[in-house]
Amino acid sequence: MIDRRAFLKSLAGLTTGVLLSSACAEGDEENSHSDRLGSLLPTRRFGRTGEAVTMLAVGGWHIGDMDEAEAEKTIETALEGGVRFFDTAEGYQNGGSESRLGKLLVPKYRDDVFLMTKTRARDTNEAWEHLEGSLSRLNTDRLDLWQVHAVRNPADVDERIENGVFDVMIEAKETGKTRYIGFTGHSSPHAHQRVLEKTDIFDACQLSMNLADVSYESFIERVVPTLVERNIGVIGMKALANGGFFGGTQHGRHGPNPKVVPNRVSISEAVRFVWSLPVSTLVTGPDNADQMQEKIDIAKNFTGMADDERQKLIEKVEDMAGTTVEFYKA
């Protein structure tokens, strides 16, 4: 039986390496904190890539979901606040999110940002089709990171490997269509474990990380240690359980959900918990520019968590662990 307190203490200790290496990746600590657009949020080392990425990233699904005027305001707010990592996927709004970034972000800021998208492809042909479509919609000839999107379980992983999807990822990197490759998922840590059993081709991994995760089918416990050991860049997501922490019936799967925020923990505490782990960046999905600014302010004022604070927060939501709050887990 895992000693959770000791495990989290050891894992949190590894965060120092992520933080201290960011300046080295840029070569100069002072220069790593600004670019032509202004001051950056703190940066963190992105695994073995040698990159230093901002600790906060903009979630592309939300950019595609809001109206265009609010999307533009949110993007500009993110850039002004020092965010330089942008997430999207071909499956978000059937390419609508990518098209929006291709219109509002890329023309003016392509060389200033780290641009990532994802593919749900099931076979070789579909993977190439998705890649070319993504590049076209994003209005660019290269990606910074292209990821296998939403691996669900070991069988799903095996199918994508057998059908050549992983081979396409390798070729896309070798031919310069993407600088780095990765994989994502939030259904089951066993899917991620399967990927890591089968291959070591990936530079990055995106996975669910939040206070409730620790107590049920935990990505933090089952996957993150291997990522750190292999020097794979860790991209956190769902710090607020994709809205599950706010309760209500918005997800339509399990009826009324218990409310975690603000009844038990604050948004700041939930986000700080993730940043206190060895994560390179955290993808946040703002519904509007004000929410984007809220996360930026939390990042600017971030301080690490002591072991006791971390454990107390976990215990506050431990009874909510499972698929009601984390509705996306299998």
What are these regions (language model features)?
Residues 23-56, 64, 73:
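C-terminal segment of N-terminal export signals and the immediately downstream linker at the start
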Residues 46, 58, 86, 101, ...:
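Conserved, mostly hydrophobic/aromatic
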Residues 1-15:
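N-terminal secretory signal peptides and thylakoid transit peptides that target proteins
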Residues 122-218, 222, 228-235, 290:
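Glycine/proline-rich, positively charged
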Residues 47-50, 102-110, 135-140, 196-199:
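Acidic (Asp/Glu)-rich catalytic clusters
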Residues 88-104, 153:
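Glycine-rich, proline-tolerant flexible connector loops at the mouths of alpha/beta enzymes
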Residues 14, 198, 222-330:
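Structured C-terminal cap/extension of enzyme domains
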Residues 59-69, 118-125, 254-262:
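Active-site mouth loops of central-metabolism enzymes
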